[in-house]
Curated annotation (Swiss-Prot):
Residues 526-607 form the IPT/TIG domain. Disulfide bonds join C70-C77. This is Cyclomaltodextrin glucanotransferase. Ca(2+) 1 binds at D54, N56, N59, N60, G78, D80. The keyword Protease does not apply. Ca(2+) 2 binds at N166, I217, D226, H260. It comes from Bacillus sp. (strain 17-1). Residues 608-713 form the CBM20 domain. The gene is cgt.
């Protein structure tokens, strides 16, 4: 456990010495590797499996698919799961404070070598799946994957898999022999290909131009065979496949291309995960520079998964890499995103990845990367470091941003920044769960405070690498005392003296300087930091993490419904496990009261589902609208808004699968339940319901369905 930085009393020094003599403390439940729902205390390291380490040359592809020199970055280079195991066991990952790895999609990919514009391409990246129930042999066998899970867990590292259920592989409707025709296999059984698709496994609507959300969902991404999630075979297959990987012991899922799959189907997918073996899940929804998307926020708040925080990444790159914005822009991003995302602590922050040019380029000042990394590691959300960032890898867009890692040096400054700061996420709950407050700012300097209970971390960053800054008038929540820079001056930071009322002495923050000061203390009042998953049915398990819960069972509240006794399956000072009570579907606030009756803060936006979920396509014909009007769907279950127009599903689509005046939408609804519903038209605050009796429909118990009705005048 990280020691308290305050150095004012002999008692503190004696306590620190005693703790050091005791050795590593048993991990608190909320920080344990076994906590699959909460990654707020973790640092993720994203590994492009083929580009990391070749631990078993015997599984390398042969022939034109392989380039052992990694000169053609579109071919396999040899990285595999054994290579990752080796780097886990030699301490490279644990040495930089990594507690979770995100690996390439592990499923079997196509074996074809595809020639695009005279250049051979392979599925080295893992995104050209053929069988979601088998492994990619270039990465390893099922046994190798199980060994990876075991090796990671033995070193307190969680394992996240990339998962791309949007599509299979490249295909051409005009050339059935192109590549592998996008074929989908079910544990070796051929389910069908893109051409002669008699089972309707795929969409056949052409390629997306990205002009609308609907266009991006129901048309192909480039030449990738787009799976039809409204097909019961596809739906069941993908849900069974993820169950297989959950059974193998994964701790998290990164969902590829969530903007390009039906939102209702994805919510039913997450309900399946959460009701089976819930794990932390986050999706990829790309946002460009300065792009703020209400659809993106809504998805993160209601889908049951969080997102890669592109808004964070783009702003950090502007401020530290490109110098196209300043610290006020960074502050604005932090404040705006905290309002827009209901679970800010679950959004995954980063500075670069495999779909962006690398943060560092050969001519750049390395300090810019080091500061961006320090900012990410101490900011809200779950930080993810792209492999090789710690080695200052450079490279433009795909595939140059996916080169083989050049070395595994543990002495680079970037590696040391992670080594020193990553452990704070487990030792100081202010970093994992705390609020964020700006304490001092100008164009080049930002000093911000993270706080949880009386635990505090203060971070000062001067992005100007040429000019120091005199810091006067800084007030923090740190108790009076002297604080050492957690980085130990690695980024030219200084120590800090704080007087009464949190007032800091005047100091100079060096050019390009970054300092981190922190204080930890026990939290005595019950304080919730994290709840996961944030969506499940009654009877499912929910994990509540935080501090100050006490050792004796108290009460958990879902709204006004109290849960006590055997329905609380675990109660420790930092973690509670509870079964969702038999309440009606809807959104609830969660809070706890300890055994003495002291109430915690409220954690809001928890969705209780009405039961197991299935994806249903609702279609309404002849729904003509005036300019500015849109069609929505409401009904008798919480998943359809319980007849509340403000919570109605929509606006519905009318361009791709069906065309105006027919409207449609894929929605998750309770399986096997008879549902009443109607469509309505909305324009601003004006609502027009369709006439006649309510439509009635009984949802299937599994698979998918389509319900098609006419608008009732």
């Amino acid at each position: 456990m990280k020691k308290i930085s305050k150095l004012t009393t002999a008692l503190a020094l004696s306590l620190s010495l005693a703790l050091s003599l005791l050795g590593p403390a048993h991990a608190a439940p909320d920080t344990s590797v076994s906590n699959k729902q909460n990654f707020s205390t973790d640092v993720i390291y994203q590994i492009f499996t083929d580009r990391f380490s070749d631990g078993n040359p015997a599984n390398n592809p042969t022939g034109p698919a392989f380039d052992g020199t990694c000169t053609n970055l579109r071919l396999y280079c040899g990285g595999d799961w054994q290579g990752i195991i080796n780097k886990i066991n030699d301490g490279y990952l644990t040495g930089m404070g990594v507690t979770a790895i995100w690996i390439s999609q592990p499923v079997e990919n196509i074996y074809s070598v595809i020639n695009y514009s005279g250049v051979n391409n392979t599925a080295y990246h893992g995104y050209w799946a053929r069988d979601f129930k088998k492994t990619n042999p270039a990465y390893g066998t099922i046994a190798d994957f199980q060994n990876l899970i075991a090796a990671a867990h033995a070193k307190n590292i969680k394992v996240i898999i990339d998962f791309a259920p949007n599509h299979t592989s490249p295909a051409s409707l005009d050339q059935p022999s192109f590549a592998e025709n996008g074929k989908l296999y079910n544990n070796g059984r051929d389910e069908g290909g893109y051409t002669n698709d008699t089972h309707n496994l795929f969409h056949h609507n052409g390629g997306t131009d990205f002009s609308t959300t609907e266009n991006g969902i129901y048309k192909n991404l480039y030449d990738l065979a787009d799976l039809n999630h409204n097909n019961s075979t596809v739906d069941t297959y993908l849900k069974d496949a993820i169950k297989m990987w959950l059974d193998l012991g994964i701790d998290g899922i990164r969902m590829d291309a969530v903007k390009h799959m039906p939102f209702g189907w994805q919510k039913s997918f997450m309900a399946t995960v959460n009701n089976y073996k819930p794990v932390f899940t986050f999706g990829e929804w790309f946002l460009g520079v300065n792009e703020v998307s209400a659809e993106n926020h809504k998805f993160a708040n209601v889908s049951g998964m969080s997102l890669l925080d592109f808004r964070f990444a783009q702003k950090v790159r502007q401020v530290f890499k490109d110098n196209t914005d300043n610290m006020y822009g960074l502050k604005s991003m932090l404040e705006g995103s905290a309002t827009d995302y209901a679970q800010m602590e679950d959004q995954v922050t980063f500075i670069d990845n495999h779909d962006m040019e690398r943060f560092h380029n050969n001519s750049a000042n390395r300090r810019k990367l080091e500061q961006a990394l320090a900012f990410t590691l101490t900011s809200r959300g779950v930080p993810a470091i792209y492999y090789g960032t710690e080695q200052y890898m450079s490279g433009g867009n795909d595939p140059d941003n996916r080169a083989r890692i050049p070395s595994f040096s543990t002495t680079t400054t970037a590696y040391q920044v992670s080594k020193k700061l990553a452990p704070l996420r487990k030792s100081n709950p202010a970093i994992a769960y705390g609020t964020t407050q700006e304490r001092w700012i100008n164009n080049d300097v930002l000093i911000y405070e993270r706080k949880f209970g009386n635990n505090v971390a203060v971070i000062a960053v001067n992005r100007n690498v040429n000019t120091s800054a005199s810091i006067t008038g800084l007030v923090t929540s740190l108790p009076a005392g002297s604080y050492t820079d957690v980085l130990g001056g690695l980024l030219n930071g200084n120590n800090l003296t704080v007087g009464s009322g949190g007032s800091a002495s005047i100091f100079t923050l060096a050019a390009g300087g970054t300092a981190v000061w922190q204080y930890t203390t026990a939290v005595t009042a019950p304080t919730i930091g994290h709840v996961g998953p944030m969506m499940a049915k009654p009877g499912a398990a929910v994990t509540i993490d935080g501090r100050g819960f006490g050792a004796t069972k108290g009460t958990v509240y879902f709204g006004t419904t109290a849960v006590t006794g055997a329905n609380i399956t675990a109660w420790e000072d930092t973690q509670i496990k509870v079964k969702i009570p038999a309440v009606a579907g809807g959104v609830y606030n969660i809070k706890i009261a300890n055994s003495a009756g002291t109430s915690s803060n409220v954690h809001d936006n928890f969705e209780v589902l009405s039961g197991d979920q299935v994806s249903v396509r609702f279609v309404v014909n002849n729904a003509t609208t005036a300019l500015g009007q849109n069609v929505y769907l409401a009904g008798s279950v919480s998943e359809l808004g319980n007849w509340d127009p403000a919570k109605a599903i929509g606006p519905l689509y009318n361009q791709v699968i069906y065309q105006y005046p027919t409207w449609y939408y894929d929605v998750t609804v309770p399986a096997g339940k008879t549902i009443e519903f109607k469509f309505l038209k909305k324009q601003g605050s004006t609502v027009t319901w369709e006439g006649g009796s309510n439509h009635t429909f009984t949802a299937p118990t599994s698979g998918t369905a389509t319900i098609n009705v006419n608008w009732q005048p």
